[in-house]
């Protein structure tokens, strides 16, 4: 098996050798919930920081204040330890404006200058949000001159009426001060490219960064896609058929798929990529190794 991996990674680097122009990469983590998972996260960070990413980001998780504190604490630790810009996700779904102002001021005073502003998931469909992402962006800008990234949805947000509504909403976020949009993960590249072209057509000129999900566990992917409106192509299901208990082969196939996606997106002019790591480094590191010191 070691020989297989050795040959595979040599092939991987061969495939990516023609990517020579500057590329920005970033990696997303979630806050660890115990000592063991935090130890694992630091091992992941130690490896991925060698790739000199543009930034790391840390999810907000659920909307509880305890979870927000976990995000804040780990963001500060990562930035201090690595010296790399670390971006907290901030959701507004279950927080008041005053609470959000306190969080924003605390981040700014701690040296955090970049926030990923999100509404957050609604778990009670009978509860209509009082604050949306565009409101959060305005609130953050009223506190300080944060750099603000937002979410975008090539396959349309699950709650959006249609693609046009999604574009209108993204444009409102840009007008409020967003300077980057990171997309939900996807496997239909044509869908992403149509979304990018639609953004350009509607004078949305910020960087649209594709979210890349390196597959290591197909069952886990299906779980995520079921709540995020991400379509799973039939060919992808066929690729992983019968591999539920073969994670090594799954990782190799997942790497190959992600490599092909990066190659095609690069050929279409994309120069920034955001990796959803799930606090794992192996596949993301292998894919990005050729990009070392490019950002």
From Swiss-Prot:
- State the pathway, as annotated in the record: One-carbon metabolism; tetrahydrofolate interconversion; Amino-acid biosynthesis; L-methionine biosynthesis via de novo pathway
Family annotation (SUPFAM superfamilies): FAD-linked oxidoreductase
Could you confirm whether the keyword Amino-acid biosynthesis appears in this record? yes
Top-tier EC class: oxidoreductase
Please give the CDD domains that the UniProt record associates with this protein: MTHFR (cd00537)
Describe the reaction catalysed, as an equation. (6S)-5-methyl-5,6,7,8-tetrahydrofolate + NAD(+) = (6R)-5,10-methylene-5,6,7,8-tetrahydrofolate + NADH + H(+)
What GO terms fall under cellular component here?
cytosol
Binding-site residues for FAD, renumbered to this chain: 89, 119-121, 133, 153, 157, 160, 166, 169, 172-173
- Residues annotated for NADH binding in this entry: 59, 184
Q: Which GO terms describe its molecular function?
A: FAD binding; methylenetetrahydrofolate reductase (NADH) activity
A Pfam family that this protein carries is MTHFR
> What are the entry keywords?
Amino-acid biosynthesis, FAD, Flavoprotein, Methionine biosynthesis, NAD, Oxidoreductase
- Co-factor(s): FAD
Q: Could you tell me the EC number(s) of this protein?
A: 1.5.1.54
Residue positions of the active site = 28
Where on this chain does (6S)-5-methyl-5,6,7,8-tetrahydrofolate bind?
Answer: 121, 184, 220, 280
Question: What are the BP-aspect GO terms?
Answer: methionine biosynthetic process; tetrahydrofolate interconversion
Query: NCBIfam families this protein is in?
Result: fadh2, PRK09432.1
Functional description taken from the UniProt entry: Catalyzes the NADH-dependent reduction of 5,10-methylenetetrahydrofolate to 5-methyltetrahydrofolate. Is required to provide the methyl group necessary for methionine synthetase to convert homocysteine to methionine; the methyl group is given by 5-methyltetrahydrofolate.
**What is the similarity comment for this entry?**
Belongs to the methylenetetrahydrofolate reductase family.
Q: What is this protein called?
A: 5,10-methylenetetrahydrofolate reductase
Organism for this UniProt entry: Buchnera aphidicola subsp. Baizongia pistaciae (strain Bp)
Gene for this chain: metF
